[in-house]
Amino acid sequence: MLPIEVVAVPQGEGKIQITGSLGDVMKESAQLAITYARVHAPEYGLDPNSIKKMDLHIHAPEGAVPKDGPSAGVTLTTALMSCLTGWPVRCDVAMTGEITLHGNVLPIGGLKEKSMAAYREGMKTVLIPKGNESDLYEVDEEVKKAIQFVPVSDLEQVLKATLEPPAKTEKNKNAQSFISNPAAESPAAAVM
């Protein structure tokens, strides 16, 4: 399991910092997450121009351990959107999946191993790419009994399943309070 953390400074200069010994593919996934957030900002009560001006810092803890691969795309996006909206990430959900520029979720490798890691961490729900649904036969029966696997095909489904927004009347108020906050941070979202 790999937690992802995001901090945003609204009165910044548009700088983006990505840390935690991330390889090129994972850094590209972070860039995709940022583009997705900017494009879809209005759907979440956010101003895309405000996001452009923010300093963003994305971090994967345990910096001494090199990390790479596209599987963290959904998690990077979830952590970023949590930070920007102020909506917490459900703590009983893990996720995995590569993302595209248009918000599609693509299959990953190692579903069996990633599922076992989620099981060991006590996760109750795991979001997997729809394209990996046929790979569930590889997952141990004990793990399948303990975890609800939710196949997803796009980031909209991921964010609906992972973020806990306030009541609809609070949506824009919450986003505005974030914008006025000198620095906001996301709770960690977990990727397998």
Question: Where in the sequence are the language-model features?
Answer:
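Peripheral, non-AAA+ core regions of ATP-driven protein-machinery
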Residues: 1-192
